[in-house]
Amino acid sequence: MTVLIHVLGSDIPHHNHTVLRFFNDTLAATSEHAREFMVAGEDNGFTESCPALSLRFYGSKKALAQAVIAKAKANRRQRFFFHGQFNTSLWLALLSGGIKPAQFYWHIWGADLYEVSNGLKFRLFYPLRRIAQGRVGGVFATRGDLSYFARQHPGVRGELLYFPTRMDPSLNAMAKERQRAGKLTILVGNSGDRSNQHIAALRAVYQQFGDTVNVVVPMGYPANNQAYIDEVRQAGLALFSAENLQILSEKMEFDAYLALLRQCDLGYFIFARQQGIGTLCLLIQADIPCVLNRDNPFWQDMAEQHLPVLFTTDDLNEQVVREAQRQLASVDKSGITFFSPNYLQPWHNALRIAAGEAE
């Protein structure tokens, strides 16, 4: 039997760390198809912190792609599970036959599916990638992303799967300890990445609430982002008074980030695609409602779980936010499919499907 190989095709430290730790701590002990990884980027201590995994690291996305293609050609029974997919060479290999459809299973992370960049090289590449995506053996994704993908590629198998957000189920009831009143605190974006469209989001928040709310913008990730942080701060201070605007430019440890989220009353996410599911989960767990772009298909996942959804086009005020908080507080968090531990069984199923052991 050939063991499934997992591929992290881009050097995205935060996401790669989450995936590797999840496999090491949760999946590797019970499945031999959860132990082999090929990773773009440096080790950064992963080998030491994930002893249950066999990890091979590659200095560039191209080097990793070449290694994957060589393995795929050497053994056509070898299957790969691609987590996210921001590696141009791998899509081209699928398109050209270097990797066969039956070898290619893909967990969609959101940004790898949507065509949002206006850069010339991306606009030229998107049509090729779209064709290649129709040739994968199967995809795993959120309900909204599955719906989006199926409209383009109805013949490709799709299974529900959620990114393994680090969550403590014991905190599901913790939000009820806090009394919510007074000035609203609004979280804008889930990171410092430009995809959050921070400036447009700040303007939208100001249009809805004026300079009457506290605005928190976490921008400590990714690194080397100071110029953009300064740009966002300048735009924010043109709208909000200094005491109402908090731009966080330092990377935060998980517990500190969790504590920050729990001080908020509302999350505001203007991007028109599925992303930031980890932050959304942690907010929902704390009974903090989220404002989404109507083009972000994750609202379908939230509605399926009977969670209140607010949209950027809604008329928002404190009364609307407090009512959404009340509705969230009435939801039994233990039954939400994209919460831990409920997302575990779909991962076991995904491993068996990608490995060819399940129909």
Curated annotation (Swiss-Prot):
GO terms for cellular component: plasma membrane. GO terms for molecular function: 4-acetamido-4,6-dideoxy-D-galactose transferase activity; fucosyltransferase activity. It is a peripheral membrane protein. InterPro entries: WecF. Pathway: Bacterial outer membrane biogenesis; enterobacterial common antigen biosynthesis. It comes from the Bacteria. Its EC number is 2.4.1.325. One of its GO terms (biological process) is enterobacterial common antigen biosynthetic process. Belongs to the glycosyltransferase 56 family. This is TDP-N-acetylfucosamine:lipid II N-acetylfucosaminyltransferase. It comes from Salmonella paratyphi A (strain AKU_12601). The gene is wecF.
